[in-house]
Amino acid sequence: MEIRVANKYALGKKLGSGSFGDIYVAKDIVTMEEFAVKLESTRSKHPQLLYESKLYKILGGGIGVPKVYWYGIEGDFTIMVLDLLGPSLEDLFTLCNRKFSLKTVLMTADQMLNRIEYVHSKNFIHRDIKPDNFLIGRGKKVTLIHIIDFGLAKKYRDSRSHTHIPYKEGKNLTGTARYASINTHLGIEQSRRDDIEALGYVLMYFLRGSLPWQGLKAISKKDKYDKIMEKKISTSVEVLCRNTSFEFVTYLNYCRSLRFEDRPDYTYLRRLLKDLFIREGFTYDFLFDWTCVYASEKDKKKMLENKNRFDQIADQEGRVKQN
């Protein structure tokens, strides 16, 4: 039986699950256009879909921000219909054998910085910068990196007065420990600097293949967070960025030098990485490491579909001849 949302979208296959609920593909029953549908139980102890839908509305119109087409409650579920995107940078990283070239990292960093700056310009911080929350588009937007998942985002300043939230300590870790800034580990209220520092760790993860604080054995979540923090603090920026360009050392040192209310100089950081891009003689051609691999995976799928279709036709023709 076909399940419909808002009497307009036919629910298809499940794409994934999260702490909030499930994500499905859906088709507009008239245009047959595909969308992503997020479902959250109305009995959820920590509902976040309403909050996230409001965030998408505030961020609406931004480059690389998914558009929300419908939000509401049907039956036992809170539902949000939004743009269907391609795989995440984490998925593509795995597809590329868990290592990105310097060229891909720099082209990716440029777009990711733009997305983070845009979110900040709308008075919010993301608080969960990680490869899983950056997705490529589909079709004509396959080279455009999108930022998603605003369930943990927080307003860091007043929309009108631009008064910054106060400095606080003793906060629990919000986000993903692997990429969290040192100040976040120390329990300090997050601000713009923390999103930028987290991006620095994402870039090193892409370049190195892993981070020194991955795979630490722990007896509890708190113990794991503590061990990650200890390793992160004890690993100097120079050691972390060993065998990479000095620009990454400069990037992370800059992030760590920012004060709580400081506005990061996004232009300076982009220029820093663009200068490295130019010095290496790269061309900004939007050909990422995954471009050929991802395309060939899709081609393989199409070939398999065509082969199956051909086999079916041949089978039918065979039956006709036998009859």
From Swiss-Prot:
It catalyses: L-seryl-[protein] + ATP = O-phospho-L-seryl-[protein] + ADP + H(+); L-threonyl-[protein] + ATP = O-phospho-L-threonyl-[protein] + ADP + H(+). Its cofactor is Mg(2+). Keywords: ATP-binding, Cytoplasm, Cytoplasmic vesicle, Kinase, Magnesium, Metal-binding, Nucleotide-binding, Secreted, Serine/threonine-protein kinase, Transferase. One of its GO terms (cellular component) is extracellular region. This is Casein kinase I. The keyword Kinase applies. Residues 9-278 form the Protein kinase domain. One of its GO terms (molecular function) is protein serine/threonine kinase activity. ATP binds at L15, G16, S17, G18, S19, F20, G21, D22, I23, K38. The active site is at D128 (proton acceptor). Serine/threonine-protein kinase likely to be involved in many cellular processes. Its main location: cytoplasm. Belongs to the protein kinase superfamily. CK1 Ser/Thr protein kinase family. Casein kinase I subfamily. Its EC number is 2.7.11.1. InterPro entries: CK1_Ser-Thr_kinase, Kinase-like_dom_sf, Prot_kinase_dom, Protein_kinase_ATP_BS, Ser/Thr_kinase_AS. It holds the Pfam family Pkinase. It is an enzyme of class 2 (transferase). PANTHER family: CASEIN KINASE-RELATED (PTHR11909). It is found in: Cytoplasm; Cytoplasmic vesicle, Secretory vesicle, Microneme; Secreted; Host cell surface.
